């Protein structure tokens, strides 16, 4: 019954697109959906060649090995750090050495924050040293630290109800984890909301799908007119323990010390490379990932994997001697973790040409075994993407789902450009996200091969179609 329903919905959805009416393109170049479908079907052999090269051939494991070399050599790549600067220099050399075209750096001013030494110790009801990670842009504590009683809450609503109890205390958030989007607001806004009710500092339960006593960092934002207070993430285990203690009526006292400090903005770069289009070089399909990371772990998963399968996509296409009609542009963003700073400045620099962008792609949710593609665009563009994804039937990755947005491509999507991202294992991703556990040990070379194949097939075919993806 489910199959019949799917078939019925699919037929209804495609009727106006496949009825023979010339609805794609403008003027005499208008084509029916059936004609475009037949055009895409002709890429079957090209798709198989890309898959064979990366999954089974001489390019297998290449993206993994390239990534391992960079992160083992450079380490984590915090915005404003020497490590990030070195990684950008290395990647520029790598892309030139790979024979890609128009390799260059585009200057960006980025935030520079350092965490310094940090610690948290529970003094009452017992002595317990707590693992913490200060949040990006947080201020530090005085040198002697902040020693105060704790108020544990599970939501902003509870904090508002108990506001008078928070004054002069450290607010601990033990918000439940249902999904990242719901929980991350406590990391982003927890300090501001705690400061509004007179708290001295805030400690937030790490935004993680799983924990082995691992704190997870990330960016947080202060609000104009609200006092700035120190803020850090603690482990799921410590947040839950203090919540249990509070429910028993225990008095909890914590000493927090943080040496965090912000510096003037630093100079950085977005890293760009291309395969120039053969027929419409001014038109662009963009593939991307971010090169910066947090200062813990290696930044292998977030977002080394996404950056390196994006590089690999161009490498595979070049290795096969392919040159699409449109320009394939690789951008490795800087300072994504500080709120998409590099991609924002790129958009400001290039937005006058947004009508020439056929598709923007971002990989920043893991490069494990993808189950499909998330896509944002018009209905006409979506059915085209469904046909493109059907070319990946040999590796059984054909789904097209909604919500293809991402921090670094949202500017373009809001401007009407279709956007795409990989659909991946989010439970695994948020187990290691922004933590000491984000290392090469998390990565799997065979899974990266498959992710790279998907990225290369989609980007090449869309770049080589006779027409750009239709917009709303």
UniProtKB/Swiss-Prot annotation:
State any GO CC term: extracellular space
The protein's UniProt keywords, in alphabetical order, are: Carboxypeptidase, Endoplasmic reticulum, Glycoprotein, Golgi apparatus, Hydrolase, Lysosome, Metal-binding, Metalloprotease, Protease, Secreted, Signal, Zinc, Zymogen
Q: Which GO terms describe its biological process?
A: peptide catabolic process; proteolysis; thyroid hormone generation; tissue regeneration
Q: Where is it mostly found?
A: endoplasmic reticulum
> Is this entry keyworded Zinc?
yes
**InterPro entries associated with the record:** CPQ, Peptidase_M28
Q: How is it modified after translation?
A: N-glycosylated. The secreted form is modified by hybrid or complex type oligosaccharide chains.
* Enzyme Commission number, as recorded: 3.4.17.-
- Judged by the first EC level, this protein's enzyme class is hydrolase
Location in the cell: Endoplasmic reticulum; Golgi apparatus; Lysosome; Secreted
Note the superkingdom of the native organism. Eukaryota
So what does this one do? Carboxypeptidase that may play an important role in the hydrolysis of circulating peptides. Catalyzes the hydrolysis of dipeptides with unsubstituted terminals into amino acids. May play a role in the liberation of thyroxine hormone from its thyroglobulin (Tg) precursor.
Sorted alphabetically, which PANTHER family does this protein's record hold? CARBOXYPEPTIDASE Q, PROTEASE FAMILY M28 PLASMA GLUTAMATE CARBOXYPEPTIDASE-RELATED
Query: What's the protein called, per UniProt?
Result: Carboxypeptidase Q
Q: From which organism does this entry originate?
A: Bos taurus
């Amino acid at each position: 019954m489910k199959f019949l329903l799917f078939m019925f919905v699919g037929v209804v959805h495609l009727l106006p697109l496949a009825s023979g009416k010339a609805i794609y393109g403008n003027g005499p170049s208008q084509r029916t959906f059936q004609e475009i479908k037949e055009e895409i079907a002709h890429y079957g052999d090209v798709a198989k060649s890309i898959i064979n090269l990366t999954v089974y051939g001489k390019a297998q494991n290449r993206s993994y090995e390239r990534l391992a070399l960079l992160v083992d050599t450079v380490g984590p790549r915090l915005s404003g750090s020497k490590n990030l600067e070195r990684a950008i220099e290395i990647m520029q050399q790598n892309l030139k050495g790979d024979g890609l075209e128009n390799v260059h750096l585009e200057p960006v001013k980025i935030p520079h924050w350092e965490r310094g030494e940090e610690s948290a110790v529970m003094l009452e009801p017992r002595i317990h040293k707590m693992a913490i990670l200060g949040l990006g842009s947080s201020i530090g504590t005085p040198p002697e630290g902040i020693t105060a009683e704790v108020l544990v809450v599970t939501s902003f609503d509870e904090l508002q109800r108990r506001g008078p109890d928070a004054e002069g205390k450290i607010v601990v958030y033990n918000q439940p984890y249902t999904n990242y989007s719901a929980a991350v607001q406590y990391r982003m806004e927890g300090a501001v909301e705690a400061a509004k009710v007179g708290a001295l500092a805030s400690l937030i339960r790490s935004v993680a799908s799983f924990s082995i006593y691992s704190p997870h960092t990330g960016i947080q934002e202060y609000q104009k007119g609200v006092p700035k207070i120190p803020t850090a993430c603690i482990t799921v285990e410590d947040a839950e323990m203090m919540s249990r203690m509070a429910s028993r009526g225990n008095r909890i006292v914590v000493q927090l010390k943080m040496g965090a400090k912000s510096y003037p903005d630093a100079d950085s770069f977005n890293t760009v490379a291309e395969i120039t289009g053969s027929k419409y070089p001014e038109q662009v399909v963009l593939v991307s990932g971010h090169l910066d990371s947090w200062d813990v772990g290696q930044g292998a998963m977030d977002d080394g994997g996404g950056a390196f399968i994006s590089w690999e996509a161009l490498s595979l296409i070049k290795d096969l001697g392919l040159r699409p009609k449109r320009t394939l542009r690789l951008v490795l963003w800087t300072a994504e973790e500080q709120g998409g700073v590099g991609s924002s400045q790129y958009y400001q620099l290039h937005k006058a040409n947004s009508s020439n962008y056929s598709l923007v792609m971002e990989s920043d949710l893991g490069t494990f075994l993808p189950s499909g593609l998330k896509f944002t665009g018009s209905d006409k563009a979506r059915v085209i993407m469904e046909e493109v994804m059907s070319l990946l039937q040999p590796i059984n990755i054909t789904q097209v789902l909604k919500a293809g947005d991402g921090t670094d491509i949202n500017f373009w999507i809001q401007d009407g450009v279709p956007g795409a991202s990989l659909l991946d294992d989010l439970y695994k991703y948020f187990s290691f996200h922004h933590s000491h556990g984000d290392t090469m040990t998390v990565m799997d070379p065979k899974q990266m091969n498959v992710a790279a194949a998907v990225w290369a097939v989609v980007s090449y075919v869309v770049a080589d179609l006779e027409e750009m993806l239709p917009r709303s």
